[in-house]
Structures are given as C-alpha cells and as structure tokens.
Amino acid sequence: MAKLTKKMKAIKAGVDSTKAYEINEAIAVLKQFATAKFVESVDVAVNLGIDPRKSDQNVRGATVLPHGTGREVRVAVFTQGANADAAKEAGADLVGMEDLAEQIKKGEMNFDVVIASPDAMRVVGQLGQVLGPRGLMPNPKVGTVTPNVAEAVKNAKSGQIRYRNDKNGIIHTTIGKANFSEVQLKENLQALLAALNKAKPTTAKGIFIKKVSISTTMGAGVAVDQASL
C-alpha cells in the first residue's frame, strides 16, 4: 500500500469524505489545503443522471463564467476576409486559413482554443486527426464553429469553459483558481450548474444533477451540498 504523505494525512484528517459541505465551507476547506508553490486550479466534477451509452443523453456545451477561469487563453481562428480582421480586433492570437493549417501540421500548436467560420471548415476538416484527440476540433455545439468569430474569440478570452460528460456520465471542468474569492468561485459554480440544467436532455429521467464535488490541483476534494447553491 502506498505510503501517505504528510499533506495527504492532513487532508484525510481534515476532510470528512462522508459529508456534503455547505458551499462556503467547502471552498474554505479547499483553500486551507491549497498549499502548492503555484496557484492551484479549482476543478469540479458533476455526476449527471444520464445514460452515457445513449447518444441522445450525452451533454456537451459551453458557458462563460462570470469571473473567468484565471487562465490566459490563446485562441487560433480559421477564417478569412472581414472575419479575419474582426477576429484580430477581438484579440485572436493566430488567424489564418491554409497557412495556419500548415503550421499545425508541422506541430506548431501554441494555442488552447480553435475557432472556425463555417466557410473555413473545408481547411479545418483536414486537421481532424491532429486536433480531435486533443479536444481542439471546432464544433458548432460549443460555439467554436460560427459565422460570428469575433464574439467567439471574446467569449474564449473572457473565461468560457467547454464541458462534455465522460463515459461514466460525469462532467469535469474548472471554475477558477484557489486565489479567487469565495463569492467568485460560488458564482462561477452556479453559472456552470445553470448551464448544465439548461442542457438537460429531454430523455433524461429522475434527478439530473446527482452530485457536485470540487477539488484543487494538488489538494483536497470535497462534496458540495447543492441546497447551499
């Protein structure tokens, strides 16, 4: 059996794994154990009442968090003409068509989000094997294939998160950093849950949001009492 580190022992002693914490208390616990030498991310896992084996029950989408994620996001945009100018003005880091595709084929991928206008998908389609496995392929369901590329760039830069359930019906995403205030983290979490409720499949029956847990990169993980949200 693996030996528990001093930090792991402290977390085990300080966190009640059988308890669902009131949200402010949950955040306070996370902050107490977020002692890494870097600013840890605050991540969330949401267990959904869906059957992930059924395609019509899978949940996928995007939402802009009111306080952002605390990360600087680099955005690449496939578009041309007036849309290219609009994307640059909105803050896109890379804008192009075939030239941008060639960079990506060479392995130059210094970006976190890829956005494309519909007319550019003929170029982006060639990059499926490169972008797909990295979760970077533009998709209209999350707003990354759109005629309004400028708005998509602004959303990505201002703290938009994308979410998709895994094979166990769980959504994993981030809601900020450990140095965010309790109010900022709570409001970001509320925004995510509101977006998930709006995206509830019509075929999903019973309780939709079954469990909400928050954790930091290197620290504690706690269940959240949904009544406190």
From Swiss-Prot:
Q: Which CDD domains match?
A: Ribosomal_L1
Keywords, comma-separated and alphabetical: Repressor, Ribonucleoprotein, Ribosomal protein, RNA-binding, rRNA-binding, Translation regulation, tRNA-binding
Role: Binds directly to 23S rRNA. The L1 stalk is quite mobile in the ribosome, and is involved in E site tRNA release. Protein L1 is also a translational repressor protein, it controls the translation of the L11 operon by binding to its mRNA.
Quaternary assembly: Part of the 50S ribosomal subunit.
| Name listed for the protein in its UniProt record | Large ribosomal subunit protein uL1
Q: Which Gene3D superfamilies match?
A: 3.30.190.20, 3.40.50.790
Choose any GO biological process term that the UniProt entry carries and state it: regulation of translation
Q: Name one GO cellular component term.
A: cytosolic large ribosomal subunit
What family does the database annotate? Belongs to the universal ribosomal protein uL1 family.
Q: Which InterPro entries match?
A: Ribosom_uL1_bac-type, Ribosomal_uL1, Ribosomal_uL1-like, Ribosomal_uL1/biogenesis, Ribosomal_uL1_3-a/b-sand, Ribosomal_uL1_CS
- The organism named in the record is Haemophilus influenzae (strain ATCC 51907 / DSM 11121 / KW20 / Rd)
From the UniProt record, which GO molecular function terms apply?
Answer: rRNA binding; structural constituent of ribosome; tRNA binding
